[in-house]
Amino acid sequence: MEYRVLPHGGEQVSVIGMGSSVIGAQPEKEIIATVRAAVDSGVNYFDMAGGHAAIFAAYGKALEGIRDKVYLQIHFGADYTSGEYGWTTELAEVKRSVAWQLEQLRTDYIDVGFLHCLDEESDLAAYQANGVPDYVRALKKQGVIRHIGLSSHTPALVNKVLDMGIVDVVMFSINPAYDYGQGDYGIGENTERYDLYRRCQREGVAITVMKPFCGGQLLDAAQSPFGVALTKEQCIQYALDKPGVMAVLPGFGNQREMREVLSFFDASAADRDYSCLGELAPAGASGRCVYCKHCHPCPAGLDVALINKYYDLAMQGDNLAREHYLTLEKRAGDCVGCGHCDSRCPFHVTQSQRMQTIQTYFGA
């Protein structure tokens, strides 16, 4: 397992966590066994937004004695008191549902408390009018919540909440389909979505990724908007390469599916490579570096993807990105203009020219 740090807190989080959207259909015994197997495999981050209320009691049993070794995302607005998933912005219902979730989970604290499913302006307005954000902030002040988060599919709404300055974690849907405007949740232009990822990294807001496989559609050529099937390894690597991403949270339906997802760590760089998207993505994606590293290795020793990432972040106002860039052993000024990267870039970025632009910007 690999781990990344939650910037506002310092927790070490597994880069692959576990979503709970599908496992609720399993018997309690299988849920408990899968959660424990995940923990034994190094998974320490779990999202609790699922379609079934049954997951909570099962998780409570599975995590007994090891609660302090894992991190739970709990959603304010997801209501399970009826036995099935429901959504509410009413404060009394939010309080009742969260209290029920904590009781079932056998815990008295929340690692990340999420404002749940803000996809429209009216959602945020309703939460605010009913005092839900104030309630979440009060619980954080009391120590019940350690971090405040937000789950959304809409970049504009995420930016609006980021402006409030209360969020440490954003749960957002990242996959090639959505980033290129395909699918029900492909909300926002490609540039708007990438700007959001960079803003999160710049401000130290961690992104946890939901729907990395686009609900399984990307794994099936017949359903994929690209007309070809991608692999789980490609989708996971795609998400992990995006600025600000801390963890990817695919749903495991059972232990077999968990092992399949975690085999990502045994996959070769070639197996994880998603540069085929350069030939599949819409024309609007052409000419932008997506940090896929298909141009690597550089004959002159440059980390072309990282140089591009630092430049893009600096252009968004991240002063730390400039400092990080200047500490690189090889910088854009070391480019010899051989054209190796230009010929290999599946997104048709003329990297040799871009290195000149970056050298001029940073002065090195």
Briefly describe each language-model feature range.
Residues A53-Y59, P155-N159, M258:
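Short, well-ordered alpha-helical microsegments
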Residues D40, G86-T208:
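Glycine/proline-rich, positively charged
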Residues M1-I74, Y80, D108, K141:
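N-terminal binding-site loop/beta-alpha segment at the start of enzyme catalytic domains
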Residues L6, M18, F46, Y59, ...:
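Conserved, mostly hydrophobic/aromatic
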Residues G19-K29, F76-K95, E121-A125, D220-A229:
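Active-site mouth loops of central-metabolism enzymes
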Residues S21-I23, A49-G51, H75-D79, L115-L118, ...:
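Active-site beta-loop-alpha junctions enriched in small/polar residues
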Residues K69-L72, I166-N175, S268-S275:
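Short hydrophobic/aromatic-enriched beta-strand-loop microsegments
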Residues V39, V43-N44, T191, D195-A364:
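Structured C-terminal cap/extension of enzyme domains
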